[in-house]
């Protein structure tokens, strides 16, 4: 096949406009699928030869040439052209140039429709596996960090207002739990990715005696698609992956938001290592948390990729439409962004320095043990709603008189409720507040250690 000749050109009397070739070409981005395209083609050739659709000699010739093409591409010695259209045609044209008409037999019982669906599933199966591993490394870093901070007490927040004292380890383990669910979503997503569409052909299957199960075995797919129309038009496996990725990025972004806030002079809870910050071109004193900010910013790109795919798919008639060419760049971008953000965060968090003294001091402020005082009254038999009202009035009294609860006299306590006794003062420490919450999933030292033991023994 000559470089300018189209594999579908038999029906046409004229040449494709050069502007159309440039407009419709996807080779500049889908060439990253070359390994998967060749892997699928080798399996397809083996199956065709096994079924007697092509001769064994032809199969051997095709497979050898495909291996050589892959080596050239691996080395960067392959010249891609716009008039190749896409990665499938680039490889097929090169194959025919090298081995002649025998190369034209490779596309027997196959369409680019099922071919590209196969390439994307092979690609995404591999990338999902890699992301699961990288995610696991970040989870482990959170776990190790938490084990070192079990006794570190910090203020917990709701509405970004100080709420109750918590262990820093409890905070860090919250992100471990989020990332653990993220990994579970990806593993479940990978299960649905791992279905082979090859053999669906254009949309209706093929009348040739192919063996889809054999091809699936070669490509390590545990199942083949059950509906050829679904197989070539389905991109929900891509959407599901990007959706799972968007949730991962949401979790990373929330953590980065906290780091950005905590690293300010107003909070001073954490110092981000200089290696992960930058300065200002005009203000010499600045130390900016650019890495954390960029993770937060790149989250928007992944969200945009998800909406792009949902919008792309929502109005497509069955089955394949050229619109589906636009699914690859959002997918590739999502894969790249998620991997880079997971890796950079993993490198950054192991070098964080927490200001334990500042966290402890701030944990005691803002009447953070007020709930403990209410629960103290509950233990004395006071209904919770009544206790809530009593403590609310106590807080108002302290604010009006510029006092803290631990500075109140017993007489002042008793003026609000007669059930207060000297043991109330023990409830007012942040250490007591943290460790009394010894329920499953609570912030006490004992509960955190138990959860870590569960994780490490699983």
What residues fall within each predicted segment?
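Short runs of predominantly hydrophobic/aromatic residues within well-ordered alpha helices
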Residues: 41, 88, 92, 238-241, ...
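Conserved hydrophobic residue
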Residues: 53-54, 78, 268, 383, ...
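Generic, well-ordered alpha-helical scaffold segments in large soluble proteins
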Residues: 44, 65-72, 94, 98, ...
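Short, well-ordered beta-strand elements within core beta-sheets of diverse protein domains
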Residues: 44-54, 123, 170, 239-247, ...
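Alpha-helical coiled-coil oligomerization motifs
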Residues: 143, 147-150, 191-194, 260, ...
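Glycine-rich cofactor/substrate-binding loops
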Residues: 2-40, 101-102, 283-458
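A helix-coil-helix interface module used to build multimeric assemblies
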Residues: 2-205, 210-216, 278-279, 290, ...
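Charged, flexible cofactor/metal-binding loops and thiol motifs
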Residues: 120-121, 125-128, 132, 155, ...
């Amino acid at each position: 096949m000559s470089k300018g000749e189209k594999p579908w050109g038999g029906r046409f009397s004229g040449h494709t406009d050069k502007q159309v070739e440039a407009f419709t070409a996807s080779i500049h981005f889908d060439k990253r699928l070359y390994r998967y395209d060749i892997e699928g083609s080798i399996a397809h050739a083996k199956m065709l030869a096994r079924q007697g659709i092509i001769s064994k000699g032809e199969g051997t010739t095709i497979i050898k040439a495909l291996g050589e093409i892959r080596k050239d591409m691996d080395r960067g010695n392959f010249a891609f052209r716009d008039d190749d259209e896409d990665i499938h045609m680039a490889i097929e044209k090169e194959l025919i140039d090298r081995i002649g008409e025998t190369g034209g037999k490779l596309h027997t019982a196959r369409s680019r429709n099922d071919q590209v669906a196969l390439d994307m599933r092979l690609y995404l199966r591999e990338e999902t596996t890699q992301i699961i591993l990288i995610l696991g490394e970040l989870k482990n870093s959170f776990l190790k960090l938490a084990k070192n901070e079990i006794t570190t007490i910090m203020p917990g927040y709701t509405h970004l207002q100080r709420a109750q004292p918590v262990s820093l380890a409890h905070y860090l383990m919250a992100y471990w739990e989020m990332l653990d669910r993220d990994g579970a979503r990806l593993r479940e997503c990978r299960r649905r990715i791992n279905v082979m569409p090859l053999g669906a052909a254009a949309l209706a299957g093929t009348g040739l005696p192919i063996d889809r199960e054999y091809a699936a075995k070669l490509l390590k797919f545990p199942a083949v698609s059950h509906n050829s129309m679904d197989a070539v038009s389905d991109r929900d496996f891509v959407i599901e992956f990007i959706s799972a990725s968007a949730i991962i990025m949401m979790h990373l972004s929330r953590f980065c938001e906290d780091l950005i806030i905590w690293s300010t002079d107003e909070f001073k809870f954490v110092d981000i290592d200089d290696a992960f910050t930058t300065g200002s071109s005009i203000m010499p004193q600045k130390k900016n948390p650019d890495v954390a900010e960029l993770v937060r910013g790149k989250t928007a790109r992944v969200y945009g990729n998800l909406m792009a795919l949902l919008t792309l798919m929502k109005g497509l008639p069955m089955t394949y439409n050229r619109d589906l060419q636009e699914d690859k760049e959002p997918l590739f971008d999502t894969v790249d962004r998620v991997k880079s953000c997971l890796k950079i965060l993993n490198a950054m968090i192991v070098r964080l320095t927490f200001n334990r003294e500042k966290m402890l001091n701030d944990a005691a402020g803002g009447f953070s043990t007020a709930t403990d005082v209410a629960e103290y009254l509950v233990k004395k038999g006071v209904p919770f709603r009544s206790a809530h009202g009593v403590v609310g009035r106590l807080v108002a009294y302290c604010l009006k008189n510029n006092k803290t609860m631990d500075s109140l006299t017993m007489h002042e306590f008793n003026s609000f409720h007669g059930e207060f006794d000297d043991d109330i003062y023990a409830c007012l420490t942040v250490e007591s507040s943290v460790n009394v919450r010894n329920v499953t999933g609570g912030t006490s030292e004992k509960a955190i250690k138990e959860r870590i033991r569960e994780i490490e023994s699983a």
